Amino acid sequence: MAGAKEIRSKIASVQNTQKITKAMEMVAASKMRKSQDRMAASRPYAETMRKVIGHLAHGNLEYKHPYLEDRDVKRVGYLVVSTDRGLCGGLNINLFKKLLAEMKTWTDKSVQCDLAMIGSKGVSFFNSVGGNVVAQVTGMGDNPSLSELIGPVKVMLQAYDEGRLDKLYIVSNKFINTMSQVPTISQLLPLPASDDDDLKHKSWDYLYEPDPKALLDTLLRRYVESQVYQGVVENLASEQAARMVAMKAATDNGGSLIKELQLVYNKARQASITQELTEIVSGAAAV
């Protein structure tokens, strides 16, 4: 059994670590609330854009934009949103596993996959497993802006415009609540039709000013940008929630470990006292 001094040192070490994890839990909780506010502020715009685009997909358009037309699939692209930092449980790896499973279904059909990464964890993971990373952006911090995301989005849209991509998806974690974050893969292009049953039984038509091409070119790019930005802010809220839960679990585990070490320390101290008493009694008997 380890000596009492060594056990006391271990207890002190765990207590110091526990203070750090508790502080990180509190910081993550504060950042999560701010991330939720940003997510709530941008969500109505993203959802409204999705509805408008859903209407367009069902509409009888006088100008058929390339983003509305299905193609034979030879290559697909994924905009993958991950975190820049770790210590957030299985948030990233669960997302990567889901993406790898989907990519396998494409490669089994001889379809190639391109990846545009947002977040350093995704970059390092897919570089290590041999993914075809064609664009990346990292280090956006806790308050990302759309201008920082334009690079990877522009690369993938250009590839789609030039016919080098036939489908485009966004991969991110959807924030449900503090305890639940769901990895999701959503199709961006070609434009997915709305799931609203009312729209499926209506024939939509529009009048465009100044002209359909100019309006749709701008609107559809804004749609893609809005969905990517919403994916990033939801993933950020998911990251802070997962980190808060992970740090709370670490703090609780530290408390359990301290109790176990305290019990071992008490036993070691009791054994030491018993040994000293035995030696005293033995010495007295010898005299």
UniProtKB/Swiss-Prot annotation:
For membrane topology, the record states: Peripheral membrane protein
What InterPro entries does its record include? ATP_synth_F1_ATPase_gsu, ATP_synth_F1_gsu, ATP_synth_F1_gsu_CS
What SUPFAM superfamilies does the record tag this protein with?
Answer: ATP synthase (F1-ATPase), gamma subunit (SSF52943)
* Assembly information from the UniProt record: F-type ATPases have 2 components, CF(1) - the catalytic core - and CF(0) - the membrane proton channel. CF(1) has five subunits: alpha(3), beta(3), gamma(1), delta(1), epsilon(1). CF(0) has three main subunits: a, b and c.
Q: What does this protein do?
A: Produces ATP from ADP in the presence of a proton gradient across the membrane. The gamma chain is believed to be important in regulating ATPase activity and the flow of protons through the CF(0) complex.
Supply the alphabetized keyword list.
ATP synthesis, Cell inner membrane, Cell membrane, CF(1), Hydrogen ion transport, Ion transport, Membrane, Transport
Gene Ontology CC: plasma membrane; proton-transporting ATP synthase complex
Recorded hits in PROSITE patterns, A to Z, give: ATPASE_GAMMA
Gene this chain is encoded by: atpG
Identification of the protein by name = ATP synthase gamma chain
Name the family: Belongs to the ATPase gamma chain family.
Q: Name one GO biological process term.
A: proton motive force-driven plasma membrane ATP synthesis
UniProt cross-references to Gene3D superfamilies, sorted A to Z: 3.40.1380.10, ATP synthase, gamma subunit, helix hairpin domain (1.10.287.80)
Where is this protein primarily located? membrane
Q: Which HAMAP family does the protein's record reference?
A: ATP_synth_gamma_bact
Q: Where in the cell is it found?
A: Cell inner membrane
MF terms in GO:
ATP binding; proton-transporting ATP synthase activity, rotational mechanism
Q: Which organism is it from?
A: Shigella sonnei (strain Ss046)
